[in-house]
């Protein structure tokens, strides 16, 4: 029900004091509940934290599972899907370039892009923030709803609002077709507006 989803997204974006789009420098690590774009989050405190089995333990390369079974960026996404101006590239690193990867790690020389987006506030105790919903997700939900309602200018405007904070230089999406059709090929450049969303 796209009209209802659009209404819900619009209402969520009206939250007092909400920052609709945070920059990567404001976000730091992605799971920081004190950033102004957070709509819904909670904090694992030391007495509640589980070092093994939590979402963060699987994601954080300074943690438990994540340090020995790292979550990696798809090479195509990093090399082709993201332009040099896409600041999200800062959330990926080669193990050799990360101080969080031990020098004697079997991964140190691997040519894979590890995600550094998620981490612990304190890896020894398991203290971490868990983010359940951000303003940017509502912005993208609203953009999709506008696209499906054939309000392509409205959808483009919302994407531009996001891109103004996430790209170091303007992102040109003028060549994308005004269409709510979507490709099923995850290793292809977007052709339609909905592909981009």
Which residues are covered by each model-predicted region?
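Acidic/polar-rich alpha-helix caps and helix-coil junctions
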Residues: 1-59, 65-67, 81-197
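Active-site-proximal, Lys/Arg-enriched surface segment
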Residues: 77-78
């Amino acid at each position: 029900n796209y009209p209802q989803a659009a209404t819900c997204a619009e209402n969520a974006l009206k939250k007092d004091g909400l920052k609709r789009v945070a920059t990567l420098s404001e976000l730091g690590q992605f799971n920081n509940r004190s950033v102004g774009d957070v709509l819904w989050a909670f904090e694992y405190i030391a007495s509640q934290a589980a070092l093994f089995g939590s979402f963060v333990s699987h994601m954080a390369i300074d943690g438990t599972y994540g340090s020995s079974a790292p979550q990696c960026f798809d090479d195509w996404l990093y090399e082709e899907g993201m332009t040099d101006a896409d600041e999200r590239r800062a959330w990926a690193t080669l193990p050799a370039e990360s101080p969080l990867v031990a020098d004697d790690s079997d991964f140190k020389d691997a040519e894979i892009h590890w995600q550094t987006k998620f981490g612990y506030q304190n890896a020894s105790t398991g203290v971490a923030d868990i983010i359940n919903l951000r303003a940017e997700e509502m912005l993208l939900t609203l953009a999709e709803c506008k696209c499906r309602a054939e309000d392509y200018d409205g959808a483009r405007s919302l994407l531009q609002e996001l891109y103004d904070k996430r790209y170091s230089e303007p992102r040109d999406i003028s060549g994308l077709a005004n269409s709510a059709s979507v490709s099923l090929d995850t290793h292809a450049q977007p052709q339609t507006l909905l592909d981009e969303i």
